[in-house]
Amino acid sequence: MSSPSSSLVVLRDLHFGYGERPILEGVTLEIPRGKITALMGASGGGKTTVLRLIGGQYKAQSGSLLFDGQEVSHLSHDQLYAARRRMGMLFQFGALFTDISVFDNVAFPLREHTTLPESMVRDIVLMKLEAVGLRGARDLLPSEIS
């Protein structure tokens, strides 16, 4: 659902932490629609955390996070996947979605950027995983392999 706002991403008073350890406190940010935006700052400043919150990999403890007018934390799995297809994120390190399987991480660009039938996507992904010795890890999350 499109918002009339010129901002595609809106964070309002966002808070996130691990247990009693705060990582982000009261972050407010708007990312304009149709613009390339960079998050820059010191190591440990929360840049990757902000991106993972926007991508729905983490859930904020409080505050509001809208993507195209929709609260990210209220999106279903399918809606979140559809929203991610519209996002372009490049992390300095790592390029995997932490909350989907190894198989789905490899399949993601094929599903997004081609019109291949799912049976062919499956075959290609399994061949790629076999080539790097990860076929047996296809159902694991990235954090479950080293």
Question: Where do the protein language model's features map onto the residues?
Answer:
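Helix-to-loop junction immediately C-terminal to a conserved catalytic motif
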Residues: G55
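The feature captures the beta-strand-to-loop junction immediately N-terminal to the Walker
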Residues: M40-A42
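Conserved ABC transporter NBD signature motif
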Residues: G63-E71
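Conserved ABC ATPase signature
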Residues: L140-S146
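Conserved ABC ATPase "signature" region
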Residues: Q70-E71, E118-A137
